[in-house]
């Protein structure tokens, strides 16, 4: 039996990160977590490129643009969609997750879903580096592992 696993080293990887400006007090912490993870695992700052978009709904189109370039080993998508009193949360979170998954499958580039979808602001804050770790850091770990796994399977 042959088992394949991606290494957890970011040396030589080029990573694009897309960050939603909406709820920036949360998303900036997710971005910091992603960058911290990439650098701790050997990525050079020059190999990390960040695109800010207005909101989470705009993430998939920029993910597609970045994944299409053939320049990135992975694209990390970061945002924070927090439930409110209207169904807007359901529409946005559903379409963003579908869009990100579609890009990854279509372009065969790891496009990592690091968009928080929470019921409360408190839950988002917890997942951005307080109680529940930093989901931006976790997204970067997934990007590293998946990038290296894709290289093995090529």
UniProtKB/Swiss-Prot annotation:
Active site (catalytic residues): 88 (proton donor)
Catalytic function, reaction form: (2S)-2-hydroxy-3-oxobutyl phosphate + 5-amino-6-(D-ribitylamino)uracil = 6,7-dimethyl-8-(1-D-ribityl)lumazine + phosphate + 2 H2O + H(+)
Residues that, per the record, bind 5-amino-6-(D-ribitylamino)uracil: 22, 56-58, 80-82, 113
GO cellular component: cytosol; riboflavin synthase complex
Pathway annotation: Cofactor biosynthesis; riboflavin biosynthesis; riboflavin from 2-hydroxy-3-oxobutyl phosphate and 5-amino-6-(D-ribitylamino)uracil: step 1/2
Enzyme class: transferase
GO terms, biological process: riboflavin biosynthetic process
Domain of life: Bacteria
Record keywords, A-Z: Riboflavin biosynthesis, Transferase
Record has Transferase as a keyword: yes
EC numbers on record: 2.5.1.78
A single MF term (Gene Ontology): 6,7-dimethyl-8-ribityllumazine synthase activity
Residues bound to (2S)-2-hydroxy-3-oxobutyl phosphate: 85-86, 127
Family per record: Belongs to the DMRL synthase family.
NCBIfam families tied to this protein: lumazine-synth, PRK00061.1-4
HAMAP family linked: Lumazine_synth (MF_00178)
Function noted in UniProt: Catalyzes the formation of 6,7-dimethyl-8-ribityllumazine by condensation of 5-amino-6-(D-ribitylamino)uracil with 3,4-dihydroxy-2-butanone 4-phosphate. This is the penultimate step in the biosynthesis of riboflavin.
Name of the protein: 6,7-dimethyl-8-ribityllumazine synthase
Organism the protein comes from: Clostridium botulinum (strain 657 / Type Ba4)
Taxonomic lineage: Bacteria, Bacillati, Bacillota, Clostridia, Eubacteriales
């Amino acid at each position: 039996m042959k088992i394949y696993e991606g290494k957890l080293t970011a040396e030589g990887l080029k990573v694009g990160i897309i960050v939603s400006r909406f709820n920036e007090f949360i998303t900036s912490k997710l971005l910091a977590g992603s960058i911290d993870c990439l650098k701790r695992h050997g990525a050079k700052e020059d190999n990390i490129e960040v695109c800010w978009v207005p909101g989470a709904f705009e993430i998939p189109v920029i993910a597609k643009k970045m994944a299409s370039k053939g320049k990135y080993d992975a694209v990390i998508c970061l945002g924070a969609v927090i439930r409110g009193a209207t169904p807007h949360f359901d529409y946005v979170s559903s379409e963003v997750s579908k869009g990100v998954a579609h890009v990854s499958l279509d372009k065969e580039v790891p496009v990592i879903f690091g968009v928080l979808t929470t019921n409360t602001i408190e839950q988002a804050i917890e997942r951005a580096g307080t109680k529940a770790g930093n989901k931006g850091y976790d997204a970067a770990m997934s990007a590293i592992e998946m990038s290296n796994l894709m290289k093995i399977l090529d």
